[in-house]
Amino acid sequence: MRVVVIGAGVIGLSTALCIHECYHSVLQPLDIKVYADRFTPLTTTDVAAGFWQPYLSDPSNPKEADWSQQTFDYLLSHIHSPNAEKLGLFLISGYNLFHEAIPDPSWKDTVLGFRKLTPRELDIFPDYSYGWFHTSLILEGKNYLQWLTERLTERGVKFFQRKVESFEEVAREGADVIVNCTGVWAGVLQPDPLLQPGRGQIIKVDAPWIKHFILTHEPESGIYNSPYIIPGTQTVTLGGIFQLGNWNELNNIQDHNTIWEGCCRLEPTLKNARIVDERTGFRPVRPKIRLEREQLRVGPSNTEVIHNYGHGGYGLTIHWGCALEAAKLFGRILEEKKLSKMPPSHL
């Protein structure tokens, strides 16, 4: 069975690993290749702070909440693993801040120790009148992609830097299954009017005294369009830009100033922080994730395509649940082709 995964961000690599983990023992040979024109450190995943938090509003597809929870539980089970540091995985506590009371999020029982802020805590943030405190996880994209790449390489997965122009091109080369994890660029391979870039820009600073995440929310300006501060292992990520439909990959000085002024107002000690890096990336925004099978007719035969893209700004938050779901779709393909029994249901 020849499988080609297109895309080498967190969605592509985790899906490749999940398929191999689930089926390599029951399907011989299982040949997996990863095609991408960008690998770490040049992917969208590399720009992300890696903070686990779904959107505040419930997803239109209820399965997405399950996939996010599966990802949190999977990561939490690795938090004391000797590999946690290599994954860029650690616990972090902090604040979500609002100007008025809002309902608790559906994921409040997934994270650890969720509670409302006390009046004394709110005194620390005079611009805000309501908030939550909880402990969540950070999975730093750059570390995690490197770790996934090493695990896949150990398993014999091959990587090829190439720009794929069409599914037909890959199918004609002999792929039995194509896994489409091309993120914001999925529309190049197949038109998708629902998919848009959600441009983000972030500043990374050296500020080791910042120990808590701080996310602010402005309902009128939409998700990710107000200041946020997220500490990592080496640097602190500052953000607050979300521009739907903007394909400009260059850093913008106006956006830089918006981020810097907003974050320094939130945490004045940042004014003394040294800027280490500044990056721009595109969140693959879609009303709901596209995670489904499609049959592609190429010449006399059919090639199976599994689509797994459109994860917006929460790819690291939901990636493992989506990888498991994609692996189940792969298993159904094998069943239909009478190539394998389904793996045990402990997934």
From Swiss-Prot:
It comes from Macaca fascicularis. It comes from the Eukaryota. D-dopa binds at Q53, R283, G313. The lineage of its organism: Eukaryota, Metazoa, Chordata, Craniata, Vertebrata. Residues 216-228 are annotated as: Active site lid that may open upon substrate/product migration in and out of the active site and close to increase the hydrophobicity of the active site, to make the hydride transfer reaction more efficient. FAD binds at residues 8-11, 37-38, 43-45, 49-50, 163-164, 182, 283, 312-313, 315-317. GO terms for biological process: D-alanine catabolic process; D-serine catabolic process; digestion; dopamine biosynthetic process; neutrophil-mediated killing of gram-negative bacterium; proline catabolic process. PANTHER family: D-AMINO ACID OXIDASE (PTHR11530), D-AMINO-ACID OXIDASE (PTHR11530:SF15). This is D-amino-acid oxidase. A motif (Microbody targeting signal) lies at residues 345-347.
